[in-house]
Structure formats: C-alpha cells, structure tokens
C-alpha cells in the first residue's frame, strides 16, 4: 500500500470537491448540502454509510481481517464570517465562509474513505469515517455520540489543517492537543477571522 502516491493521483478530483464545498459553506447544525455531496461520493464508490440525520454521515469500511474499530473524525461546518479573499471559488453565501479549513477536512474524509475501501481486503478491523456537524463550539460531537453509532469505536483520530506547516507534511503529538477545557468570552474588534488567530 502506498497511500501517498494513490492520494496524489486524486489531486484534481479533490481540488474540485474542496472548491465546491468552499463555495457553499453551511452553518453549524445545517450542513445538509455538504452531507449530500459526501454521500454522493461514498455511494459512487460503493462505500457503506450510516445516515442518522441530514447533517451526519458515517462511512463504514470493514477490513477483511478481524480487529478493533477506529473512528476518523472530520468536521463539516463553516464560520459566520464574510469572505474577503478574491479567489475563483469564493463563498457564494454572504456572512458564511470556510475560514477554519473544514472544507479541506471534509474533502480529506471522503478520499480517506475511498482509499480505505480500495484496500479493505488488506485491512484489519472496521473504520468509521465520521462527518461531524457543528464543531465550532456547537456540541456537534455530542450530536454524533447521541446517535449511538460510534459507541463501538475503540480509538478516535482527527486532523486539522494548519497554515504554519508546509503543505504535504504531517505533525503529530502523543495524547490530546488543543482540547477545550473551558469556555470564556472576549470581544475583539477587527476585520474578522478565526477565534484562534483574530486579525
């Protein structure tokens, strides 16, 4: 298995899918179009899925050999911000944009599912690719857990794009990172941006 080479072969398709999601951002709890697009891709490639709600999709890939169940979580919601960038795939929805990379995360999830499906006969265990709504402080993980469809997951993994690192690199740390221990409110005046890096 050479996942990197295979993933690079999907680059054109991935870019088109990403740009479509970027043009059509959806707020927390209303990621219905995003999930329809995800489901179209999964169905086209024969990937089993669980669809407990219009805004939650869980792709399921069973490996040929027994093993544990792994959850791979990808968030889908956008931010309530006006996009100021002038790119060909700019948000078509006033006051909404993918400013935190969830369009990229969702794209990664779709193509991870495709790669795992392609190699299912070589894999152990079960893989659940979870397209989570409402990650932006809106209890989307609770919504997924409440479905009961991830109670069998032995280990969860997630990812986040970060512009501080070069494209094509992976950075990991043992244990949790950037876990939210508490909520607080502050007021920042500026042009706009993500709460982690306000302008």
Q: What is the predicted role of each segment?
A:
Residues 1-98, 107-110, 114-123:
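Acidic/His- and Gly-rich active-site-bordering loop/insert found
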